């Protein structure tokens, strides 16, 4: 699994690629910690997970997202989900994670919910 990072104004976009399951969840969580352990004001207003390149997520992967959201909230931040592929969206819906994490159809829509500046920065790329 790869985890690409982009910053749009005051919002961090993290883009996992491939599969998120028991085999790589610990490494994924470790990679996330460096972005989530800082207070929101010092790093970013929030984090958007662009799941457009995530092919599959298991229950272990869902747990990683839940822990990330909890950690972000503890530091005054917020996590949003965007651009889920149909299979991943179905897993989120069946597991009712759509009630835990706010999801948006596009990265731009998620960015807009954080700040107009981040959406404009995204439009310039």
Predicted regions and their residues:
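General small-molecule cofactor/ligand-binding pocket signal
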Residues: 4-6, 82, 102-104
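Short, glycine/acidic-enriched loop or turn micro-motifs at the edges of active sites
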Residues: 18, 53, 105, 109
